[in-house]
Curated annotation (Swiss-Prot):
Organism: Pandinus imperator (Emperor scorpion)
Expression by tissue: Expressed by the venom gland.
GO BP: defense response to bacterium; defense response to fungus; killing of cells of another organism
Coiled coil: none
Function: Amphipathic peptide that possesses relatively strong activities against Gram-positive bacteria and a fungus, but has very weak antimicrobial activities against Gram-negative bacteria. Also exhibits mild hemolytic activities against human erythrocytes (16 uM induce 70% of hemolysis). Furthermore, this peptide potently inhibits the growth of vancomycin-resistant Enterococcus (VRE) S13, a pathogen that can cause a number of human infections.
GO CC annotations on file: extracellular region; membrane; other organism cell membrane
Cellular localization per UniProt: Secreted; Target cell membrane
Superkingdom as given in the UniProt entry: Eukaryota
Propiece span(s): 40-68
Protein name according to UniProt: Pantinin-3
Keywords from the named record: Amidation, Antibiotic, Antimicrobial, Cleavage on pair of basic residues, Cytolysis, Fungicide, Hemolysis, Membrane, Secreted, Signal, Target cell membrane, Target membrane
Modified sites of kind Leucine amide: 36
């Protein structure tokens, strides 16, 4: 009975590892496909809009308020 329970636990752990690694690897593969795809390289330019290098006076005032 102990052996069967141990085999069941080992099988469950291995199944969980397999299912999680499958999801992880498919996410990596989809990321690679989107980067190397025909439109993937053109859409990387949209990431530049996420960063605004200018800090306004309101931002500085807010940071000072947070620090005090």
């Amino acid at each position: 009975m102990k052996t069967q329970f141990a085999i069941l636990l080992i099988a469950l752990v291995l199944f969980q590892l397999l299912s999680q690694s499958d999801a992880f690897l498919s996410t990596i593969w989809n990321g690679i496909k989107s980067l190397l795809g025909r439109r993937g390289l053109n859409e990387l330019d949209n990431l530049d809009e996420l960063f605004d290098g200018e800090i306004s006076q309101a931002d500085i005032d807010f940071l000072k308020e947070l620090m005090s």
